Amino acid sequence: MVDHIRIRGARVHNLKNVNVDVPLGKIVGVAGVSGSGKSSLALGVLYAEGSRRYLDALSTYTRRRMTQAAKASVDEVLYVPAALALHQRPAVPGIRSTFGTGTELLNSLRLMFSRLSSYPCPQCGRWLEPSLAVAAEKPLLCPQCGASVRALSAEEFAFNSQGACRTCSGTGMVMTVDESTLVPDDSLTIDEGAVAPWKSLMWSLMVDICREMGVRTDVSFRDLTDREKDIVFHGPAEKKHIFYHNKNSNQAGELDFTYFNATYTVENALSKVKDEKGMKRVEKFLRQGICPDCGGTRLCNAARTPKLRGITLDKACQMTLVQLTDWVAGVPDSLPEEMRPMARNICESFQTAAARLLSLGLGYLTLDRSASTLSTGERQRMQLARAVRNRTTGVLYVLDEPSIGLHPSNIEGLTDVMHDLVADGNSVVLVDHDTQILKEADWLIEMGPEAGAKGGHVIAQGSIPEIEQNAASQIGPFLAGRAGVNARPHVPENELFAQGRIHLATSAIHTVKPLELELPKGRLTVVTGVSGSGKTTLILESLVPALQAKVNGTALPAHVKSVEAEEIAQVKLIDATPIGINVRSTVATYANVHDELRKLFAKTQDAKDHGYKAGDFSYNTGKLRCPTCDGTGVISLDVQFLPDVEVPCPDCGGSRYSREAAAVKLPTANGEPASMADLMDMDVSTALEACADCKLVRQRLQVLKELGLGYLTLGEETPSLSGGEAQRLKLASEMGKGQADSVFVFDEPTIGLHPLDVQTLLGVFQKLIGNGATVVVIEHDLDVIRNADYLVDMGPGGGDAGGRIVAAGTPEQVRQNPESITGRYI
């Protein structure tokens, strides 16, 4: 019997002809330093081939409607099952997505309400008992007055369909004109452009019509009477005969024109917006608020009327999942006897889906919570629950960093899911660095030994005890507990606030209670807490926008009472969202190295002989870019009925440059002249040696190396970088500056980081702090937590059981706090 997947000659990304057998029916961990080829093996080979072969079994007609993976660069993959992948960074959903729609729990709930609800009689107001007539698509009859009521279908309870509130179209939010933005500078006169929309939305004629309406346009706006201001903001749409003078053409004329007040000017422009560019011009005059008709529930009045167990659908969606599950359990017994079998079937489908989410620690979320406000870890667990709830067998699940966003106390739910999958006859391959999760693996494959070009080899494989004893393994000492991340110097407790403090006061929002937060300036503060305790809300939705508002002199977010941050002039959020969306953005361009290299090449004698300027060396717009691929390095072949195939450009071989560019060489420090294509093909460490004589290039490459990115090639496309790599590359431009007035906020920077890489990351934090910066990190990684100067622990639980600051102080103080769950793991 076949008991393993056989991989031979894998060459995806940096894999070096890898031959490896992956056990089936087991949990297989894939470890290794960042950039060593873990995701290339797990996602680029196993998932790509598993999903592609499954889709190949479908008809051509069906495949045409699906996103297909291209064939992996591998000699042979045998015995691979159909594969499902959970990616490291699930996409941030749109405004129409909620926790209920994303988990599909709302589908069951809508079905429940459409089949089992009570309806009020439209004539006498009496509530009509639930009846099987609804399932038979017959009307309900009022026993008192005989009136008939048509029950709503499940579709009519959907806010993305027929049940949507007419005012907000089912989004729960409306855009209204913000009057405070219409006249940004009231010292100006209307003639000088005081009314911003008339100036920017091309209604300059309104100044002349406004004058005809009786408003003085040569007096500063603040000195106008209330009546005049009201005409500017809300005046009636009257037609006026005006004489106008066009300053540009110096022509005069007369015409009849209808008055558009400042508010209507914006509303009219908004109604005509067709693209993002148009929206950008209008949005500065708008503010988002809760819909006045549906109160943010997204549902029309009809969908908010029927009741089940005494509550309406919008009220059910406002319960936490724990509360809602208890409520659903009591639904069948609250109904007439003949309806209970049908009710049990519907409720059972809800309970089954909810059970998995509860075991993954998401019981604190409400179904109406907007999916875009969820943390990455929460979105990933939603994705995981959806993938595993069907109890299928014989499937390969590839999990990319499933521990993202998971507090050590939440990891148990995740490991239970993995063991359940294997018990059902599936195989699990997980890419992770968390030793707590890797210890659950039956077999471990370690990639390495280094990153990028120096990685791509299998350096160790075996069971966990075998890896712990394997001298070649880099993760082994961490699994065995023999190695740890070296501590950075701690600040004495009495000096924590010596450089000042940042103070934030908020009122309640989501599940977070009113809070008072104090952070020390010039220190490393780590914000911890179980999943759902309110870390994202406190830092990303409160602290960051409050500091940005203070710096920009704009209004604080509605739920922020006050913020005190003396001498803070800039706030930088460094998150793991991908950099750029196309192949034209590379490491060299993002790190500002490419521009400097172009200038150096333009100064060479070869370039002068051919008359080349710096701009000619750009692979995006220069004359030396490859004409075949237009400087992208790849060409896309449109193959009918198959996914588009991207192949390296046959003319430039992927270098992005034409043959003429190869004739221009730059002398390098290691003695071998290099063309621009040669340099773009080097990794950062090699290029650093080659460009040792070029001061500015050397400095910028040195920063990348110190950030632990020495293995990236200069020509690597930025969208292909992992979350952790993207975060550190964003930091590159910030390093080396004086930063006493800066606050850096990191959202889980250890994503994708091996314990050895965490050591580098702590060095980066120390460098920022050495330059005077204040560093705030949302993190679950225990090594980072132990190395903090100051901890803020949210909790004690998730959702309603959390949302407050349980402990704040040094790691030692938090460890001794009995209420802190994080403290038990430090």
Give the positions of each predicted feature.
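Conserved phosphate-binding elements of NTP-dependent enzyme cores
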Residues: 1-826
